């Protein structure tokens, strides 16, 4: 299972709210790009996958210079810190 549509919409909304100059298509594209990066990690646990996605969207929405890869890495580090 990939990222649920509900979470994709929430993630795209977080990005769009912080960058109103972006079109909704661009915000959705950014969210889908983050979802693809997470898919490449092969995370099997759905809760982890979805949580990392939302965190990565929030990181991107706070720092437009943050690459999708770095946002996902940062979200995964945060997951590991909280999980420890």
Predicted features along the sequence, with ranges:
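Amphipathic alpha-helical segments in structured regions that serve as interaction surfaces
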Residues: 3-20, 24-63, 68-83
């Amino acid at each position: 299972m990939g990222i649920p549509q509900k979470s994709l919409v929430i993630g795209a909304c977080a990005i769009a709210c912080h960058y109103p100059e972006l079109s909704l298509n661009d915000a959705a594209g950014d969210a889908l790009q983050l979802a693809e990066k997470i898919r490449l990690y092969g995370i099997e646990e759905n809760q982890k996958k979805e949580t990392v996605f939302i965190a990565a969207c929030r990181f991107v929405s706070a720092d437009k210079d943050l690459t999708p890869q770095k946002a996902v890495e940062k979200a995964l580090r945060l997951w590991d810190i909280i999980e420890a």
